[in-house]
Regions:
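A short, structured beta-strand-centered segment in the mid-to-C-terminal lobe
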Residues: 64-79
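Short, contiguous alpha-helical
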Residues: 7, 16-62, 97-159
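Amphipathic terminal alpha-helices
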Residues: 83-86, 147
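Hydrophobic alpha-helical packing residues
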Residues: 6, 79-83, 126
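Short secondary-structure junctions
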Residues: 10-15, 90-91
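Catalytic cores of extracellular degradative/oxidative enzymes
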Residues: 64, 85-99
Length: 159
């Protein structure tokens, strides 16, 4: 799935690139790669506690000791396992009810969908960064993979 692709891409990022800054955004490559896994963490925490999904949790920075691509990928593997366990546990549940978020109420289904496409966009960005770093990757998420999602063909925000 998406998180598996993310982990495989993150593992390939050279550690000496993690401090580089993203185009048109004051965010390091390290922070972006952590963030793409923090998005489902925030969703899962909301699911587990019933508390409001906050912006602060969504953009929480990586721990200071998470300084290698391998460490970020390990975090990603843990998130993937937690997400898969949640998906198994909630299979067949009603997702039409409202859940509390920092941007107002939305349905559980819409929040899950938003979590998936938000992470997907950042995975596309990591793929682009790997290309900039001249790292070969077998498969990137392309335009054909995102059809039907509320994403543009643009990978980066414009200045």
């Amino acid at each position: 799935g998406i998180l598996e692709i993310a982990t495989s891409l993150v593992k390939k990022m050279p550690d000496n690139k993690l401090g580089n800054q993203l185009p048109n955004r004051p965010r390091s490559w390290r922070v972006l790669m952590h963030h793409l896994f923090q998005i489902p963490v925030a969703f899962l925490n909301m699911e587990d506690t019933g508390e409001t999904l906050t912006y602060e949790e969504l953009v929480a920075p990586p721990p200071e000791d998470m300084v290698t691509s391998a460490a970020i990928a390990e975090f990603g593997d843990q998130v993937r396992e937690r997400f898969n366990a949640w998906a198994y546990r909630t299979n067949g549940e009603d997702f039409s009810g409202e859940v509390p978020t920092y941007f107002g109420g939305t349905t559980r289904h819409e929040m899950l969908e938003r979590t998936v496409w938000h992470s997907t966009q950042h995975i596309r960005q990591v793929g682009s960064l790997l290309e900039q770093a001249e790292v070969e990757v077998e498969k990137l998420i392309g335009s054909e993979d995102i059809q039907g999602l509320p994403l543009t063909n643009e990978i980066w925000d414009q200045a």
